Every structure is written in C-alpha cells, then in structure tokens.
Amino acid sequence: MQNIPKNMFEPAAANAGDAEKISKKSLSLWKDAMLRFRSNKLAMVGLIIIVLIILMAIFAPMFSRYDYSTTNLLNADKPPSKDHWFGTDDLGRDIFVRTWVGARISIFIGVAAAVLDLLIGVIWGSISGFRGGRTDEIMMRIADILWAVPSLLMVILLMVVLPKGLFTIIIAMTITGWINMARIVRGQVLQLKNQEYVLASQTLGAKTSRLLFKHIVPNAMGSILVTMTLTVPTAIFTEAFLSYLGLGVPAPLASWGTMASDGLPALTYYPWRLFFPAGFICITMFGFNVVGDGLRDALDPKLRK
C-alpha cells in the first residue's frame, strides 16, 4: 500500500459563518404538507380512488347505450354479463349506468353538505371565538342545545315534514352537521386571536372581518380542510341510511343508498343488486377517510422537519 505524505494535506479552516448557513431550503407549510401527503402511500391510494370514481360518474353514463331510468321487464334481474356489466334490477334497468348516475347524486350530497357545514361552521365559530364573553356563551349554548338532540332523529323528522327531494336531504343534514365544524374553528380562533400578527393588525385599525378572514381563518385552514374532507363520507353514509328508511331521493332518480335499499330484499337470489352500490359506498368512504387522515398528518405542525 502506497504511503501518502502528510504535507500534501491541508486542514480545513473552520468558518464561523458556516454554522449560520441553512443547509436545506425552507418550505412553506403547504408545500411541506404536499410533499408529506404525496409520500403517504395510503392517502395517495385514497385520492386515486376518489378521482377514478368521480371520472366514472361523469363519463361512464355518456358512453353507455342504456339509460338509467329505462325499464325492460324482459331483462329483469339478469346477472352480470357482457351486455350488462353489473346486471339488471327488478325492472330491467342497467345497474352499471344506475351505479354511476347514483354516484353523481351521492357524491353531490356529500360534497354539498360538507360545503354548507363549512360555510355555517366557519362563520359561527369565528364570530363566537373572536368576540368571546357573553356572545361566545350564547352562541355556543345554542350549538350545545342542537348538539344534544340526536342528529339522525332531527334529520328524519325534517325529512318527514319537508317534501322529499335532493335539496331537502342536504338541508336536513346541515341542520346539525355544522356544529362540529364550528367547535373546531372556535378553538382555532381562540388560539390565534392573541398572536402577535393579529394584535399588530388590530392595533393598526383593521376591521373584525379583515382580522378573521385575512389573518385568522387562513391560518386555521388545515383543521378546516381535514374536517370538511371527513364530513363527506359521513354525509354519503347518512343518505344511504335515509334511503334504507324510504326517505331518500325520489324515483326515478338513483343514488347508491336507494339502490342498496332496493337490492337488500333480493340479496339471497340476486346479490349483485346490493353488492355493487354497497361496495362503492364502502370504497368511497374508505377513499375520503384515508385522504382526510393523510391531510391531518401532513398538516400536523408537530411532524414538520
């Protein structure tokens, strides 16, 4: 082995400024959250599932020669085949087309209910948390009273009183659905309203609306987004349960809930009538739940590196 003389080496001079240098480029909260979300394989699987279901709901009925409401008693209760991929129901309607038309309605109900919960909950929770004092007490006691009533019971009562329809279901779900969002937003506002940048803006004369929707709510958007994502599968499941009770969307409209309700009595002899709508309810709920969990982990400041 060849010996290398020591005089060929020169010790590296320590630079005091090197300790102050940032070795890694700093990332914003959202960029860092996006990177960690993309590294979460289960969350990405859930996102792909949701995107595929939405695309199929939009385009699949367009390329089928069957209509979701056309009946043909000669083809009633046919098993899955090359002509009817998911089989037919008791009226001879193609279950494949009805499944994807039902996906439009079920997902629309879930997203619409989540958006209304977001709007009402953010406004209610923001005002309650920011005002504090007697205003906070009154607003949260009202929310507690509504929360004390079983939400499903209130939804069923409203569905009985109001005329059956798509928007009636959404309104009934929103009556108590916003309370959880309001509580979360209120907690975030109570933490953020005493931060230095909020106090500085308040000192400079910023209005309450600007303080809330310019400084406070955007910084609470992580928790809001996660809660909204987890609200969608709950609304889809609630619609399915209401359909089982006969309070779903009226015929000839199809949702996963109404299809599952119609297919349940025929489970023994025609299982495909229940299997496909119930299966997609489970898959969609799984997708939204794992995406919500992934967002929660990605936006958790304790996990930031």
Swiss-Prot record:
Instruction: Summarize the record's induction comment.
Output: Positively regulated by TnrA under nitrogen-limited conditions.
Q: Which Gene3D superfamilies match?
A: MetI-like
Coiled-coil intervals in this record?
none
How is the protein disposed in the membrane? Multi-pass membrane protein
**Alphabetical list of PROSITE patterns matching this protein:** ABC_TM1
State which residue ranges cross the membrane.
43-63, 105-125, 166-185, 212-232, 236-256, 274-294
Give any GO molecular function from the UniProt entry. Answer: transmembrane transporter activity
Similarity comment: family membership:
Belongs to the binding-protein-dependent transport system permease family. OppBC subfamily.
The record's annotation in PANTHER family points to: OLIGOPEPTIDE TRANSPORT SYSTEM PERMEASE PROTEIN APPC, OLIGOPEPTIDE TRANSPORT SYSTEM PERMEASE PROTEIN OPPC
Tell me the function of this protein.
Part of the ABC transporter complex OppABCDF involved in the uptake of oligopeptides. Probably responsible for the translocation of the substrate across the membrane. Required for sporulation and genetic competence.
Protein name per Swiss-Prot or TrEMBL: Oligopeptide transport system permease protein OppC
Q: Which organism is it from?
A: Bacillus subtilis (strain 168)
Give the gene that encodes this protein: oppC
